[in-house]
Amino acid sequence: MCRFIETIRVDCGEVRNTAYHERRMNDTRTHFWPESPALQLAGYLPAIPGSGVHKLRIVYGQNGIEEVTCTPYTLRPVRSLALIQADDIDYACKSTDRSALNRLFARRGAYDDILIVRRHLLTATSIANIALFDGSHWHTPQHPLLKGTKRAELLDKGILTEKDIRMEELPAYSTIRLFNAMIDWGEAELPTDCLHPVF
């Protein structure tokens, strides 16, 4: 049976971006199980720690929310990315099955993470959406592996612009940022010369 995840940042007792997570969870359930009722996260939240950053992990499926955990979170530093080609990968929904991503991640060699290239277009790392800076604007791939909740928020705020970004266009960009529900905007940034093709 298909199972999916929402990973939510809890920052000093504040559960972040619940509306975006709730919308994606219910959109996913409607896609796979059209008759499924909408769920509200508020009814499933555990006791929330009042200090520090925590990862709230919600596993759900056809029958609703199945598992909720809340654990301390530490950002894993990323200082280099291996560009990995994977034309057939599909991770449009945040599934518990990450086996395809894990196989690609295992090919990273000495680099910290991977940046997946699908049909010549940049998509995402193994865990995060990306944005690249051209000196004036932050562009995020129009067709990422997964349309993350932080990505949706940044697009709604006008901070990001969607654009197809081809690998050969990388010299036009100076900086890449990684972000997701747990990694805030500006928290993970590196120069584009830290991206290395591994084909």
Describe each PLM feature range:
Residues 133:
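Short beta-strand-to-turn element immediately C-terminal to the catalytic PLP-Schiff-base lysine
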